[in-house]
Amino acid sequence: MTDPIADYLTRLRNAIQAKHRVVEVPASNLKKEITKILFEKGYILNYKFVEDGPQGTIKVALKYDSVNKVNAIKKLERVSSPGLRRYTGYKDMPRVINGLGLAIISTSKGVMTNKEAAELKIGGEVLCYVY
C-alpha cells in the first residue's frame, strides 16, 4: 500500500456511504493520532485500539444524527500524498469552509489541527481536510 492515510480516509468514507455504525481499519501511530483528533472535535462517536498481531486495528464508531441519520462528517479530503507533499507555514494555515471545518497537520510537535498549529506558530504537512 503506497498511501495508508488515503486508505484510512477511504475506509471511513465507504463506511459512511454504507451507513455502517463501526468500521475497522489497520492501526498505525499516525492513524491513531488522526482518530484522536476526529474524536476530540466531535466527528466520530468513539474509537478503540485493538492489539491483535504486530499491527493491531482501530475500531471507529461513526457518529450519525438521530433524527435525519446524517453523518457528522460531510467530507474527508486527502491533501498531501506520497507523490506530492503539501507543506504550509503557520502564517499560511488553510481555512476549511471559513473555519467551520478543520485541516489535520503533521508537525514537528506531533499531529494537530490547523488552529492548534497556528497558535503554536509551527507549520507542517497538511494531511487532510475534514468537514
Sequence positions of predicted segments:
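Core subunits and conserved enzymes of cellular information-processing
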Residues: 1-131
